[in-house]
Amino acid sequence: MIGERLKQARTVAGLTTRELAEKAGVSAMAISKYERGETAPSSRVLMDLAKALEVRIEYFFRQAELSLERMSYRKHRDMPVKEERKILADVRDQIERWLELETILKTPWSTPFKAPDKLPDRVTNLDQLEDAAITVRETWELGLNPIPDLIDVFEERGIIVITTPFDAGQKFDGFSAKANDKPVIVINDSAYGDRQRFTLAHELGHLLLKDRLGRGLDEEVACNRFAGAFLVPKPYVLKALGNRRTWLEPQELMLLKHEWGLSMGGWTYRARDL
């Protein structure tokens, strides 16, 4: 147990075995042996490791069996493997603490997540996603106006939302997964607000549309369309832009961005789609 925890904490900290060894005052070989479970650190070394990794001693003894499944990433192809592992380790740590609190409090944070019953069993074209997005809003009693706080909305519906810092450019937006059968959405805490909102809506699309998309529909394209439709429903796009436009003024898009929390580029895509 300690070995797995040590490796996870080291990965979150972004340290190599040698770097951690220097901070904790032990050899890199000792760190490797601890992580492989070949030897156990003494109490003094464990305290030094906790200090170097900025975690509490209890972290190394936390018992939590976590299974992350059906992961859907929004990342760039050139994202370093080391950074990806760091994100996953941080996410696992946060989810474990979330689930641990549920166990301690002996009560769930919210009602279990459930996809709206009226969603279509099979989506055969992207235009169906316009109505699907409205169905979700209506089922969740959100109306069709701008949604101020998506994170609150998602958490109230049983989705665990995790923010993780990643400032190495824009190589990572987020991902969705199932953690012990609970839906999880992870977003980049360093991204701009409108980008975070789109990622949240996009990943909601993955959670809802998985196994519903017909043959020939690309899941990423479908989730992008759903995200735009969820953030700004079709009736309000037509109301704001009209049924036919050949030009969009930047100032107009800027005002709509601030009202709806959808980027100017996102509004351009909404206009093109409709």
Residue ranges, per PLM feature:
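Short juxta-domain linker segments that transition from a proline/glycine-rich
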Residues: 1-274
